[in-house]
Amino acid sequence: MYKGSHTKMINQRKQLKTIIFLSSLTGLILVALIVFFGFSYILATATLVPAIVSCTFLITTSKKQNGGFLYNTNILTGPIILLGLLVTPIISTIIISTIFSFAIYSIVVSFLMPMTFVSIFFYLPLSIYEKYFKKNTTIPLIIPTLTVIVPAYNEENNLGKTLRSIIEADYPNKQIIVVDDGSTDKTYAIASKYKIKSSSKNRYCIIRKRNGGKASAINLGLRFAIGEIVIIIDADSIIERSALKEMVKFFQYSDVVAVAGRVKVLNRSNILSNCTALEVIMGANLLRSPFSLFGVVMMVPGAMGGFRKKSILQRGLYDKSTLTEDFDITMKLLKNGGRILGMSSISFTEVPLTLRDFYKQRIRWYRGNFQTLLKHKDITRTNRKYGMLHKFGYPITLFTFIIPPFLDMAIIGFAVIAILGGTGMSLVVPFVLFMFLQLLLSSIAIMMEGKEDWKLMFYSPLGILGYKQIINFIIIKSIFDVLLRKSFRVTMR
């Protein structure tokens, strides 16, 4: 019995390494060909070196166990990750640019290209494995008690649809708690209509309180929660019928403390909302999967997230010290140990349709994200206590949040200088490569999504020029607002 299980584990490990190696090698060859035929073959060296480092890192450290990844902590260290993602591209770029006497804007371009390509090698193989090769988690024999908490403030237009989707969700004996956070519209009246549908299978509870914010509403709901597992759903989200049962499956593993749901855009009606939809799809399929396999999904979204109730209680509930309480509670749970995974079931939510509303939403998100990263900066000073959070989750999240926006603004500045100096044609090939890369990534993400509208591909170029710059501007502003300690009201003006 033991010998057979051991042999099976070895075979699974070999299969995993082979998949990662072949996926990485395919991407490596593809990018090398793109760079070569783009008449920028010299940059291939700067691209290949960090890519090889990343591939080697993945191959030599991966072990598959219990549907997730565990790593040899003697091999896997933060410096190795930073070497592959940051240090090696910088060194490669400096050496190559010095040898071939590149102009300053060419140096920036040659640095930015490897940085972009490395992210593909680091994320894409794991994303492909998680999507197509990872075995599905089986439904546990014992169905745990479940509580769904819906914090609501002035949600008269959305709450009814949300509650209907929860009540109709396929899960036995669930408790539904609606917390009206001092709404001034008909939110409470709408919530009360669904109380008559309360039954032995759907125990329904409405709590009314003075306005205190989402964190206080959730904390109050937790006081009345009877479920071993608590799922928190925003009042403007609509969940799939199988979402609750799919989410609970992951909690059969005792070390899983939370599960992040998938979000899809419901109101795709203009350019902005379609760009947001594509951004969400790419983030879910290409970026989140590696974090899930490592057990360190860094954000359990408010649209739909599941938690082991005792884990939240142990970490002191939700905190109002940042603007993104969802990110903060996720970090607190990760610091306390255990895994946080991502799931494939979906909740649908509406996104802003105007630039003004989009700015208001994102400035709050990004300010809150940076506040949370600073609040938990002690993770970087601890070598062993926080495990994969210290070695992978936090440094990668911090790096990808801060560095890309400034790099993007820098490349735009140098491009303007090049155009004004009459050498703008030298930027044509890098721009074409970036555009092709964006289209390639978008098509992969849409294909991995499955039932998705391929018309979103038409919005892919805006991920390079347009939508991307709007997001980067808001991120940069949010960083400086936090560092300068500007109040949120000042930011919102």
Predicted feature residues:
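A conserved acidic beta->alpha catalytic loop
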Residues: 172, 180-189, 211
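Long helical/loop segments within the catalytic core of UDP-sugar-dependent glycosyltransferases
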Residues: 126, 210, 215-217, 221-223, ...
